[in-house]
Amino acid sequence: MQKIGSITIDDTYYPGKDLYSDGEIEDEMLDIAKNVPVSEYNRVIAERKSWAILYHFSNVRENIVQSMPITKEDSVLEIGAGCGAITGVLARMAKNVDAVELSMKRSLINAYRHQEADNITIKVGNFQEVEQHLEKKYDVITLIGVFEYACSYIDSEQPYAEFLEIIKKHLTKDGRLI
């Protein structure tokens, strides 16, 4: 476990190395997250002219969930949180967010970006292992940009169906899958 600002990173199920990475650009993104205020991200995006930095740091990606019926009463499980492009808006909308991410570096980027949020916990590790230790049910579970990769991290002959069955166990009775 480690703390970055108000964010707790639970590395209990982290295998010790990142099994997914975009390479050296992630070092640059971690530096940005550590040293550049969020209010300056658009300036950095314009200066760097990098697709990866635009993709991971643009607040435009928040639009994907801003109109969703998520309230301050909701508990959210974000599967595949990446560098936190959506984690922040989920935290502003919901009571709490448990973010699951396979990569420690991406989890660190996420934590530094949102270190002032007091309602985010990041769990680092393969979802199939992490989910066995989730202690609550969620009102909202997000699969934004990760469902199509289920065959890479769900050990099953039918990984997509298995993934949905696993997720279903963690939804409240009236829970929503996004």
Locate predicted features.
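A short acidic, Gly/Pro-enriched loop at the edge of an enzyme's catalytic core
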Residues: 132-141
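Conserved alpha-helix/loop element of class I SAM-dependent methyltransferases that forms part
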Residues: 55-73
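Conserved class I S-adenosyl-L-methionine
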Residues: 73-82
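Class I SAM-dependent methyltransferase SAM/SAH-binding core
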Residues: 93-129
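N-terminal auxiliary segments of SAM/dcSAM-dependent transferases
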Residues: 1-35
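Conserved SAM-binding loop of SAM-dependent methyltransferases across substrates and taxa
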Residues: 83-94
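A short glycine-rich, Lys/Arg-flanked "PGG" loop and its adjoining helix->strand segment in the class I
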Residues: 158-176
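A short SAM/SAH-binding and catalytic strip from SAM-dependent methyltransferases
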Residues: 140-157
